[in-house]
Amino acid sequence: MTFQELGLNEPILRALADQGYEQPSPIQAKAIPPALTGRDVLGCAQTGTGKTCAFASPILQRLSEARTPDHRLRALILTPTRELAIQIGESFAAYGAHLSLRHTVIFGGVGQNPQVEALGRGVDILVATPGRLMDLYQQGFVRLEDLEIFVPVSYTHLRAHET
């Protein structure tokens, strides 16, 4: 199976090739086709299996096929940690390199002004941690009325229990 057979468009195929992707992983092969049609997908897989690509590439394709000139927020990816938010933001930048969509990442622990400025320029995709999302939403900098896609990202942290 190839990424082309999954139904991804040429700009995304080119970006995946730029990143060294040759063929889809099992989670990508199962998740991408239904996600491209707008169906809800719940995916679970180990670290390093390509989960981010499995949800990011269909989001990028769906939004690029129905572009809006004003870059309204249409996809929200909610992640528990700053580190994961940054990683997912980097993936959106890489997979969307040949598209005209805008994304930004917001998280706490840093000044909010650069994040507010990025939101003010308009974004199609927002990757956020819950605390900063709520802060900027309550201040009126994040508007959700045009939201089409919501992806809650979580991870499982395993730790040994003392006996």
Predicted regions and their residues:
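Short basic/glycine-enriched coil/helix segment immediately N-terminal to the Walker B
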Residues: 139-148
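Conserved nucleic-acid-binding Ia/Ib motif block in the N-terminal RecA-like helicase ATPase lobe
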Residues: 71-135
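Conserved P-loop/Walker A NTP-binding site and adjacent catalytic elements of P-loop NTPases
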Residues: 30-97
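Conserved small/polar residues in nucleotide/adenosyl-binding loops
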Residues: 156-163
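Walker B beta-strand of ABC/ABC-like P-loop ATPase nucleotide-binding domains
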Residues: 127, 151-152
